[in-house]
C-alpha cells in the first residue's frame, strides 16, 4: 500500500489522479490533499477518500471547511504552510504535485527534504527553479517521476537505456485549439474558442498555454532538467492526433516512441506504480487501423512565438525562465478574464523578457523576488 499526498486535487490532473486511486483502492491510500477554493468539488472527494489532512487556498474556504462535520477526523491547513504540511506528513510515500503555477515549488522542495518520491505534474516547479530542484533531488536521493504525458513517454522510452546514447528528445505537440488558424485569424479569437482543445481534457490555464504553445515551451524546459539534455538536442514536432506522446532518438538514429490514446490517467498511474504497471479500467485500447494515418509538421517559431520565447529563455537560463513563467501566468489570467486579446499574451511576455536584468545563478530568494517583480510589472502594463 502506497500513501499518497495529492496537491491540487480539484484540478484536471488531481481529479484524474483520484480516478486512478479509486480504481486501485488495494494499492493506494490518500492521506493528505490540497485544493484552492472549489469547495463544492472538494467536499465529495474528502468524504470518499477520507484524508487525514486537507489544505485550502484561502481563509474564506478554510472557515467554510472548518464548519463542516465529517464522519472521520480530518485536520485543515491553509496556504503555503498547509501545502508543506500536507506534503511532509510522515505517512506520505508519494507527493503528486498537480498544483497550478509556481506555488508548487516550496512544497516540492520540502517534500524532497523529507525523502518523499515526487510525481511531478507541475511544470512551473522545474521551469522556475530547475537547478535548485535537481540539486535538492540529488542531495536527498529522491526520484522525480514525470506525470506529463510527454515526459512520461520519454521516461518510458529510456527504460533500460543509457543517457550517454541519447541523440535528441522529440516532444510532440497537438498544436492546441488554434493549430489550423493563421496569425491574422488569431487576432479575433475568443476565450470560448481557446478552451476547446481538440484532443485532451485539461484545465483552463493549460488549455490556453496549449493554444499559444507555451505549454510545449514549458515542457521543453522541464525536459531539459528532468533528463539533463541540452536544449540543442530537444525538438518539437506538431502531431495532431496526440497518439505518439514523445520520442527518443539515439546515436545510431534508431527512435523509440511511446504511443497510446490520449488519456492522462495512464502517465499518472505509471508515475504512481513505477517501476511496475497495473491494469487501467476503462482505458481505451489503441487500434492503429482505426486511426489509419498519423500526421506530423515542423513547429514554426514565427507562428508560435511563445515556443520561441521558451527555447530562448531556457538557453539563457538563470532567472529568465522564471520571468517567462510569471509573465505568462499573469497574461493568461488577463486573457481568461477578457481583459486582453489572445495575441497580447505574447506581447506581455516579450516585454517582460526584454525588460529583465538577468541573474545567472539565482538563489531561491532571488527567484521568488524576480517572480513577484515580474507579476507586478505585467499587471502594471495591463492596467
Swiss-Prot record:
Cofactor(s) named in the record: Mg(2+); Mn(2+)
Pathway annotation from the record: Isoprenoid biosynthesis; isopentenyl diphosphate biosynthesis via DXP pathway; isopentenyl diphosphate from 1-deoxy-D-xylulose 5-phosphate: step 1/6
GO MF term (any one): 1-deoxy-D-xylulose-5-phosphate reductoisomerase activity
EC numbers on record: 1.1.1.267
Keywords: Isoprene biosynthesis, Manganese, Metal-binding, NADP, Oxidoreductase
Top-level EC class as recorded in UniProt: oxidoreductase
Gene3D superfamilies: 1.10.1740.10, NAD(P)-binding Rossmann-like Domain (3.40.50.720)
InterPro entries cross-referenced by the UniProt entry: DXP_reductoisomerase, DXP_reductoisomerase_C, DXP_reductoisomerase_N, DXPR_C, DXPR_C_sf, NAD(P)-bd_dom_sf
A Pfam short name: DXP_redisom_C
Catalytic activity of the protein: 2-C-methyl-D-erythritol 4-phosphate + NADP(+) = 1-deoxy-D-xylulose 5-phosphate + NADPH + H(+)
Binding positions for NADPH per the UniProt entry: 10-13, 36-38, 122, 124, 203
Any one Gene Ontology BP term: isopentenyl diphosphate biosynthetic process, methylerythritol 4-phosphate pathway involved in terpenoid biosynthetic process
SUPFAM superfamilies: 1-deoxy-D-xylulose-5-phosphate reductoisomerase, C-terminal domain, Glyceraldehyde-3-phosphate dehydrogenase-like, C-terminal domain, NAD(P)-binding Rossmann-fold domains
Zinc is among the record's keywords: no
Sequence positions that bind Mn(2+): 148, 150, 219
Record-listed 1-deoxy-D-xylulose 5-phosphate binding positions: 123, 149-150, 174, 197, 210, 215-216, 219
NCBIfam families, per database record: Dxr, PRK12464.1
Family indicated by similarity: Belongs to the DXR family.
Protein's job: Catalyzes the NADPH-dependent rearrangement and reduction of 1-deoxy-D-xylulose-5-phosphate (DXP) to 2-C-methyl-D-erythritol 4-phosphate (MEP).
Name of the protein this chain belongs to: 1-deoxy-D-xylulose 5-phosphate reductoisomerase
Species of provenance: Bacillus subtilis (strain 168)
UniProt gene name: dxr
Amino acid at each position: 500500500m502506497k500513501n499518497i499526498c495529492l496537491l491540487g486535487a480539484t484540478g484536471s490532473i488531481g481529479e484524474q489522479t483520484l480516478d486512478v486511486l479509486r480504481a486501485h483502492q488495494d494499492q493506494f491510500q490518500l492521506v493528505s490533499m490540497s485544493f484552492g477554493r472549489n469547495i463544492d468539488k472538494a467536499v465529495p472527494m474528502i468524504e470518499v477518500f477520507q484524508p487525514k489532512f486537507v489544505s485550502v487556498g484561502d481563509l474564506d474556504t478554510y472557515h467554510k471547511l472548518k464548519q463542516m462535520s465529517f464522519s472521520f477526523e480530518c485536520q485543515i491547513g491553509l496556504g503555503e504552510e498547509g501545502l508543506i504540511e500536507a506534503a511532509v506528513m510522515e505517512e506520505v510515500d508519494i507527493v503528486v504535485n498537480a498544483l497550478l503555477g509556481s506555488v508548487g515549488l516550496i512544497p516540492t522542495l520540502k517534500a524532497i527534504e523529507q525523502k518523499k518520491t515526487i510525481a511531478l505534474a507541475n511544470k512551473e516547479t522545474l521551469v522556475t527553479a530547475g537547478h535548485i530542484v535537481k540539486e535538492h533531488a540529488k542531495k536527498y536521493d529522491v526520484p522525480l517521476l514525470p506525470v506529463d504525458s510527454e515526459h512520461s513517454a520519454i521516461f518510458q522510452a529510456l527504460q533500460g537505456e543509457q543517457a550517454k546514447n541519447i541523440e535528441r528528445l522529440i516532444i510532440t505537440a497537438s498544436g492546441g485549439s488554434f493549430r489550423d488558424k493563421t496569425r491574422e485569424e488569431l487576432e479575433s479569437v475568443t476565450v470560448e474558442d481557446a478552451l476547446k482543445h481538440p484532443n485532451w481534457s485539461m484545465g483552463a490555464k493549460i488549455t490556453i498555454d496549449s493554444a499559444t504553445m507555451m505549454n510545449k515551451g514549458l515542457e521543453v524546459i522541464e525536459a531539459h532538467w528532468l533528463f539533463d539534455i541540452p536544449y540543442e538536442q530537444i525538438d518539437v514536432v506538431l502531431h495532431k492526433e496526440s497518439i505518439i506522446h514523445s520520442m527518443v532518438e539515439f546515436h545510431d538514429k534508431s527512435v523509440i516512441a511511446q504511443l497510446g490514446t490520449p488519456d492522462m490517467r495512464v502517465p499518472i498511474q505509471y508515475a504512481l506504480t513505477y517501476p511496475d504497471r497495473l491494469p487501467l479500467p476503462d482505458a481505451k485500447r489503441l487500434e492503429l487501423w482505426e486511426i489509419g494515418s498519423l500526421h506530423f509538421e515542423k513547429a514554426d517559431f514565427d507562428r508560435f512565438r511563445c515556443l520561441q520565447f521558451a527555447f530562448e529563455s531556457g538557453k539563457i537560463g538563470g532567472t529568465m525562465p522564471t520571468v517567462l513563467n510569471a509573465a505568462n501566468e499573469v497574461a493568461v489570467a488577463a486573457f481568461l478574464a477578457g481583459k486582453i486579446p489572445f495575441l497580447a499574451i505574447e506581447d506581455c511576455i516579450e516585454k517582460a523578457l526584454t525588460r529583465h536584468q538577468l541573474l545567472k545563478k539565482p538563489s531561491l530568494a532571488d527567484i521568488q523576488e524576480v517572480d513577484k517583480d515580474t507579476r507586478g510589472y505585467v499587471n502594471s502594463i495591463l492596467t
